């Protein structure tokens, strides 16, 4: 009888170890849903009527997280739809909205767990760049357009825009939990408060972003590196946008699928910022201050 019991315990132990090993690699599918008008309104951006008419009422993008015991990668899946039936098209505005998908846009993110490193790989001006990054909480570059982009701007005003004061950030961890893809997730609410002028009156406006994370997978990750508090983030929910894990499949993942390409050109955050500022100057000049103007410039992958 004792031998039978020990044999059963041995089988259960082996099964438990095998199951644990199985859950150290796999693929998680994410879906990002964006309501552009609500998203821009939440950031205080005044939308011209012509631009609003071209906006889809909602846009969906898909992303995939691949992970194994040592590395992970997060990148867009080539399948996008919007409520206007534009499929993968949607014109310039559709492409612009996809550039904000989960803050991933057309970027690829590569993680190494041992040293907690994160790099971003993206194309800009026909060149593939790689930039050192990291998980952090930075609501200024979070889910909204933020930064005063297009906010109450006069197209004929060539003066240097006034600096925008950074928002006040408060993180509230609640006792709430919910199941996402069979994993227990905990809630952290990020409250971002900034001063805005509404109807010629200065008011404090607070945006809330709900982050749902799990510690069951054993590694740190967020579909938006600027919206991370701890653990593996499986859902980010804000006004007018959300990114949520829809499914998880535990399977073998090769190292080459989660390793950054070696031929990309290195770029620092400061160099990237300078390039983007120069691009925005050309963008405003070509389009007379109108997003998506005559120059047709589309800027992808904000949130770096």
What kind of region is each of these model predictions?
Residues 1-28, 302-304:
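Bacterial Sec-dependent N-terminal signal peptides
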Residues 21-304:
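Extended soluble regions of mature proteins
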């Amino acid at each position: 009888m004792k031998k039978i019991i020990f044999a059963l315990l041995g089988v259960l132990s082996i099964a438990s170890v095998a199951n644990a090993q199985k859950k150290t690699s796999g693929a998680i599918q994410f879906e990002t849903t964006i309501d552009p008008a609500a998203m821009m309104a939440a950031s205080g951006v005044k939308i011209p009527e012509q631009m609003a008419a071209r906006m889809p009422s909602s846009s969906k993008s898909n992303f995939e997280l691949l992970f194994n015991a040592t590395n992970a990668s997060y990148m867009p899946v080539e399948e996008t739809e919007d409520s206007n039936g534009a499929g993968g098209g949607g014109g310039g505005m559709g492409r612009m909205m996809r550039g904000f998908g989960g803050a991933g846009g057309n970027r690829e993110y590569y993680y190494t767990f041992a040293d907690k490193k994160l790099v971003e790989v993206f194309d800009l001006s026909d060149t593939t760049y790689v930039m050192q990054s990291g998980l952090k909480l930075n609501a200024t570059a979070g889910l909204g357009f933020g930064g005063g982009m297009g906010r109450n701007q006069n197209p004929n005003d060539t003066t240097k825009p006034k600096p925008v004061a950074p928002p006040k950030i408060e993180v509230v961890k609640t006792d709430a939990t919910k199941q996402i893809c069979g994993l227990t997730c905990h809630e952290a609410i990020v409250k971002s408060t900034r001063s805005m002028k509404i109807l010629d009156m200065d008011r404090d406006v607070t945006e809330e972003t709900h982050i749902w994370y799990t510690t069951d997978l054993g590694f740190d990750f967020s579909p938006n590196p600027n919206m991370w508090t701890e653990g593996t983030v499986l859902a980010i929910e804000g006004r007018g946008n959300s990114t949520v894990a829809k499914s998880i499949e535990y399977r073998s993942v090769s190292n080459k699928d989660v390793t950054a390409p070696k031929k990309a050109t290195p770029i620092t955050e400061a160099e990237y910022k300078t390039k983007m500022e120069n691009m925005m100057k050309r963008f405003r000049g070509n389009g007379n201050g109108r997003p998506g103007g005559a120059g047709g410039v589309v800027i992808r992958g904000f949130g770096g």
